[in-house]
Amino acid sequence: MRALFLKDAETAPAIQTVEDSAAGAADAVVSLRAAGLNHRELWIAKGQYPGMTLPATLGADGAGVVETVGSDGDQALSGQEVVLYPGLGWGDDLRFPSAGFGLLGMPGPGNIAESIAVPADNLFPKPTHLDFAQAAALPLAGLTAWRGLTTKAGLREGEALL
């Protein structure tokens, strides 16, 4: 498949042919219709993102259609339009991520590609009032905003922010 691939910090990202990401029993394969770009991809390309292992397929935000679902996943997802939640292994404490937390594109393959295998639990219905490009722009920005409000600003249920 084709994907936005970064060989090293000295080479510009380029569209290349890469192997399909391996899907496990709890995964779903999503055919991407749109992927969002974040400043994170620029930092990665400049070698300024800590913990990044190169070479890598870039991208954390995306929306598409579920192609297949692994044997342990919800088969009703097949054919559904979805948004990818980019967080992997947040843990049980909503205030901060676990030590094993990661994002799509770090350490595994990113989603600026024709398709990606992700945990089926990381898929959410695409809002019908959004097209794929609009939906793809939401996940990581939304997670960043939510975390800023809840963990940094300390906003709690029942409180409001203006």
How should these model regions be labeled?
Residues 1, 80, 158-161:
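Nucleotide donor/acceptor-binding cores
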Residues 14, 26, 60, 97, ...:
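Exposed loop/turn and edge beta-strand positions of beta-sandwich/beta-sheet ligand-binding modules
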Residues 10-15, 39-41:
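Short N-terminal binding/cap micro-motifs at the start of the first secondary-structure element
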Residues 40-45, 93:
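Cytochrome P450 core scaffold surrounding the K-helix E-X-X-R motif
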Residues 21-35, 48-91, 107-110, 117, ...:
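Glycine-rich beta-strand-centered segment in the early N-terminal region that forms part
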Residues 86-162:
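NAD(P)H dinucleotide-binding glycine-rich loop of Rossmann-like/cofactor-binding domains
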